[in-house]
Amino acid sequence: MSQIKTIAVIGTGVIGTGWIIRFLAHNKIVHAYDKDIKLKKNLIAEIKRAWPYSKKLFNKKKLNLKNFKYFTSIEEALSGVDFIQECATENYVLKTKLMNTIGKYAKLNAIISSSSSGLLLSLIHI
């Protein structure tokens, strides 16, 4: 993961927030995407709330929010990223549409990862 510098997290719910915190703890540049700008304030508050626990877990001293950017445009969020962590709702239609959109805007050598736990990848039609 040391070669990965910039990461996009698609979806800023509970799972996405957890990934964002982990990636920030490892000094990655994080592009968070959610279509609702109103969620940004709550997301930053949650990152700050969880940081004392993350400091202990990852042995980090300081949270660097300069590495954090919030986007409401998926195209902008995916621009130039090395790794994409998809964290959308568990729904085949939604995931299929989202993965096709990610494929459209991601750079060719970007790694695409999904936090799906109850869906079969073979049923997500890309």
Where are these regions (language model features)?
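A short beta-strand-to-loop transition that corresponds to the Sensor-1 phosphate-sensing loop
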Residues: 115-119
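Conserved small/polar residues in nucleotide/adenosyl-binding loops
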Residues: 124-126
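Rossmann-like NAD(P)-binding element
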Residues: 35, 53-111
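Short, flexible active-site loop motifs that bind/organize anionic cofactors or intermediates
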Residues: 5, 30, 67, 85, ...
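Ligand-binding pocket scaffold of soluble enzyme catalytic domains
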Residues: 111, 121-122
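NAD(P)+-binding Rossmann beta1-loop-alpha1 motif at the extreme N-terminus of oxidoreductases
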Residues: 1-53
